[in-house]
């Protein structure tokens, strides 16, 4: 099993990545889920980002093997703690940076911007929840909270009114945030890639439309209790996983 505290294993992972990429140097090396120690126990001390992984990153940076050190995580507040250590150049924040899920704006984005870090917005379509209009599913999903259901209704009414497809609206919303450097998209087909490119080419959203989206987002400012991390629209739902040990 992978040991995130083993310097030799970390170096081996890096060299394997270089070999697979056909490169001797990597522009950005990111620590995956640095904010969830029950998934990857990277740190000897999280508050100052101290652990073997940083020793390896500092060494690789000094050797010119990597240009930038990054964080890639999904929490809205622990990530900010790591950002404030000043040891990183780039942050990828996912699942808290989209039309309706905006917790990254409370601490992650401001902390990264203050330090001049590159900010990558991951999962702008919220793992498919914003990839299309799920009108029937929103009305029938037993796991969806009443406030979130009403929020989706308002969003879909706005989509119908302005005539902008929901994926395009989602991308152009993020394009309207000047502190975000990169929008990280997943695409399953050439058509989806073309659609993303076309949406970006239309540029940021106008201020009046952004204001209306802000009003809709404010209806549910924080994720409701027990809301599935990835909304299972169109998929079987087996309930919320049990909480693990603290």
Task: Annotate each language-model stretch with its function.
Residues 1-11, 40-46:
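Active-site mouth loops of central-metabolism enzymes
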Residues 6, 12, 27-30, 206:
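A diffuse structural propensity rather than consistent per-protein peaks
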Residues 6-20, 74-82:
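Short, acidic/polar
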Residues 20-26:
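A glycine-rich helix->loop->beta "capping" turn
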Residues 27, 34-220, 232-246:
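Beta/alpha (TIM)-barrel catalytic core signal, keyed to glycine-rich beta->alpha loops juxtaposed to Asp/Glu
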Residues 228:
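Conserved PLP cofactor-binding pocket of PLP-dependent enzymes
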């Amino acid at each position: 099993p992978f040991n995130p505290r083993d310097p030799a294993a970390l170096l081996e992972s890096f060299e394997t990545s270089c070999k697979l990429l056909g490169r001797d140097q990597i522009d950005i090396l990111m620590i995956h889920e640095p904010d969830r120690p029950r998934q990857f126990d990277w740190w000897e001390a999280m508050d100052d980002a101290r652990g073997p992984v940083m020793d390896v990153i500092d060494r690789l940076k000094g050797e010119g093997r990597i240009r930038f050190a990054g964080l890639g995580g999904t929490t809205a507040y622990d990530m900010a703690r790591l950002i404030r250590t000043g040891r990183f150049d780039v942050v990828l924040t996912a699942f808290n940076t989209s039309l309706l899920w905006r917790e990254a704006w409370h601490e992650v984005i401001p902390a990264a911007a203050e330090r001049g870090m590159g900010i990558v917005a991951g999962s702008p379509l919220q793992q498919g929840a914003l990839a299309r209009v799920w009108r029937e599913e929103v009305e029938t999903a037993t796991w969806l909270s009443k406030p979130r259901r009403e929020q989706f209704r308002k969003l879909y009414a706005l989509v119908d009114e302005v005539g902008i497809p929901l994926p395009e609206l989602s991308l152009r919303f993020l394009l309207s945030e000047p502190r975000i450097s990169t929008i990280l998209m997943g695409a399953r087909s050439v058509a989806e890639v073309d659609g993303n490119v076309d949406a970006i080419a239309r540029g940021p959203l106008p201020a009046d439309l952004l204001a209306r989206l802000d009003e809709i987002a404010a209806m549910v400012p924080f994720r409701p209790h027990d809301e599935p991390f990835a909304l299972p629209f169109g998929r079987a739902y087996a309930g919320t996983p049990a909480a693990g040990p603290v």
